[in-house]
Regions:
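Bacterial N-terminal signal peptides that target proteins for export
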Residues: 4-17
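Sec-dependent N-terminal signal peptides
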Residues: 14-21, 31
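C-terminal motif of bacterial Sec signal peptides marking the signal peptidase cleavage site
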Residues: 26-28
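Functional-site microenvironments in short loops/helix caps that host divalent-cation chemistry
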Residues: 33-50, 71, 78, 83, ...
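Short, low-structural-confidence N-terminal segments
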Residues: 47-56, 62-63, 67-70
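Short, P/G- and charge-enriched loop/turn segments at secondary-structure junctions
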Residues: 57-59, 89-92, 494, 524-529
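A short glycine-rich, aromatic-capped structural motif
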Residues: 61-154, 167-190, 353, 537-538, ...
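Catalytic loop of the DD-peptidase/beta-lactamase superfamily, centered on the K-T-G motif
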Residues: 518, 523-526, 531, 536, ...
């Protein structure tokens, strides 16, 4: 009797075990189909099927790090001053901001990097041809910035940009507009190399270009058949581009191989990257604050091996740009080669000293954190692709290229041949929107009509009035070149009260010409975007797409 009872119990125990195993098998089989990345969660259809249908890069892992870049993991930080405002500018009052993760150049753009840009322009758009002469000329740095009435600096005028001795020194004499155009060129050259590497373009395609057949990332993504002036469907196409039945295959945004644009960093990004607060983080709190990009309240190194040496290249005192012969404090009189000093905690070099750097923002004395405390940036001008009479996107050609004349008379190309023409967004994009209402937002809430003391109601926004008396920032407005003084004229009005307008840009950081006060990352200065100097350079940034970091692990310390 006992034996039969035990046998029955054992049999009953087997039933749920078998049912459980069966359930696991069913879940496993069913889970495979439900969790398959090549099966649509919306329709159940197969993705990337040989028969056709929806095609998507389901194997995408992570954004590729572009040449020269370092990943900066985003976060929150106090943007603004952390020391006494001895200059009494009151233009960097502390405000809490958050920036997304992004990439930034490890170093400033060097003379060698910029010379590569000039070489490409000269080969593709020969300056000896009348229609192209202003493309190359407009990109040339102003080497005369080294001149001073009471200084013997002609050696730098003649040699600094082109001599190989200065190859790894930061480029100077570049205005804000030129820095933006270099960034656009760099974007296209990097993506062109990626497409060639991955077989979408011929290996030597990028070496066979001329003024009528250049590569543009924007053109390739939006109207790929017109890339290289239409030659992509012939000798410029790569192995992957030759699809079945003669159909061309192009990389798309969904392919995930093309990088976002190289651009100037925003002021918030630059300051966040320079401060590199991850160096003083423990768990989820900061242990103190940073005055400089390194972990010290002083400009000299406290490390045993380098104790007493300056941590950046800046002016030591009146008439002292580098110390005594044989015992240089900062290893240079003018600029020095990039990577001369140790990097900050993000791995970035020269975020203090050497040269100050252009950032993307239009200058205003106040950061309006009531409107934005996320990815703060003043300077948005929203554009869209121009559409021709045939309903197609307009590609700039050598015959349709347009030039802009800057306030100082310098002529620069607005867009290079091969790029898509753009126009400001209009009411078709802004109608009944609440997040933005205009294309040009540079003076939003600080310089537009609604922010002036003359504003009474919404009807004033469309009214006309004296631009001198109704403007919040009554800045000089030089006449467009073309009349007096050999094509140049000055604003001689005595009514002007400010140098601030929508074409004045922020530059950050100290330089070889500056005292230690300016190497604090929070300090801000500004100049008109057409001005170049011997102490301002730039570096590029790139937005990160996808996850905030490359790993999901939190670390106790930065």
């Amino acid at each position: 009797m006992l034996t039969s009872v035990f046998t029955m119990k054992r049999s009953l125990l087997k039933v749920p075990v078998c049912l459980a195993l069966t359930g696991l098998l069913l879940v496993g089989c069913g889970g495979k189909s439900k969790g398959d990345k090549n099966i649509s969660s919306a329709t159940g259809w197969k993705i990337n099927a040989k028969e056709g249908g929806f095609q998507y890069n389901t194997d995408f892992k992570d954004q590729e790090t572009g040449p020269g870049l370092v990943l900066i993991e985003g976060g929150t930080f106090t943007m603004g001053q952390v020391q006494d405002n001895v200059m009494h500018d009151w233009n960097n009052v502390p405000t809490q901001q958050h920036v997304q993760s992004f990439y930034m150049d490890e170093t400033e753009v060097t003379n060698k990097m910029y010379m590569e840009y000039l070489d490409w322009l000269k080969r593709v758009f020969p300056p000896e041809e009348e229609q192209y002469k202003n493309i190359y000329k407009g990109a040339l740095p102003d080497t005369l910035v080294w001149r001073s009435p009471l200084s013997a600096n002609e050696a730098m005028v003649a040699n600094y940009l082109r001599h190989p001795a200065f190859a790894e020194y930061p480029v100077v004499g570049v205005n804000w507009v030129q820095a933006v155009q270099f960034s656009a060129w760099r974007t296209d050259r990097v993506n062109e190399a990626i497409l060639s590497r991955d077989g979408y373009l011929a290996k030597d395609a990028r070496y066979q270009v001329d003024a009528t057949s250049t590569f543009s990332t924007d053109t390739y993504l939006n109207t790929p058949s017109q890339t290289y002036g239409g030659k992509i469907q012939g000798e410029m196409g790569g192995k992957k581009a030759s699809g079945k039945d003669g159909q061309m295959t192009y990389a798309k945004q969904t392919s995930g191989i093309l990088l976002p644009e190289y651009r100037l960093p925003t002021e918030a990004e630059w300051e966040y990257a320079a401060k590199s607060l991850n160096g003083i983080r423990q768990y989820n709190s900061l242990q103190g604050r940073k005055k400089y990009p390194w972990n010290s309240q002083y400009t000299r190194s406290t490390e045993r091996r380098t104790r007493g040496e300056q941590m950046a290249n800046f002016k030591q005192g009146k008439g002292d740009y580098g110390g005594l012969a044989g015992w240089s404090d900062d290893k240079g009189d003018i600029t020095v080669a990039v990577k001369t000093y140790p990097p900050n905690d993000f791995g970035l070099y020269d975020m203090a000293g050497n040269v100050a750097e252009w950032v993307a923002d239009v200058y205003r004395p106040i950061l309006d954190d009531e409107v934005s405390d996320f990815n703060y940036y003043r300077g948005n001008v929203y554009m869209k692709h121009a559409i021709g009479e045939d309903g197609k996107q307009v590609v700039v050609t050598p015959e349709t290229i347009k030039y802009d004349t800057l306030s100082n008379g310098k002529i620069v190309a607005r867009n290079l041949p091969g790029n898509l023409a753009t126009v400001p967004v209009d009411s078709s994009e802004t109608y009944l929107r609440y997040n933005f209402t205009h294309s040009d937002n540079r003076s939003y809430n600080d310089g537009d009509k609604a922010s002036t003391r003359k504003f009474r109601n919404q009807n004033d926004l469309g009214s006309s009035g004296s631009e001198y008396t109704n403007s919040m920032y009554n800045a000089p407005k030089p006449k467009k070149p073309g009349t007096e003084l050999n094509g140049k004229d000055y604003d001689t009005s005595n009514d002007r009260t400010s140098l601030i307008d929508d074409e004045v840009r922020v530059f950050k950081g100290g330089s070889w010409r500056d005292r230690a006060f300016w190497i604090d990352p929070a300090q801000r200065r500004y100049l008109p975007q057409y001005i170049a100097t011997d102490y301002i350079g730039f570096r590029n940034a790139m937005s990160r797409v996808g996850s905030k970091s490359k790993t999901n692990h939190r670390t106790p310390r930065g």
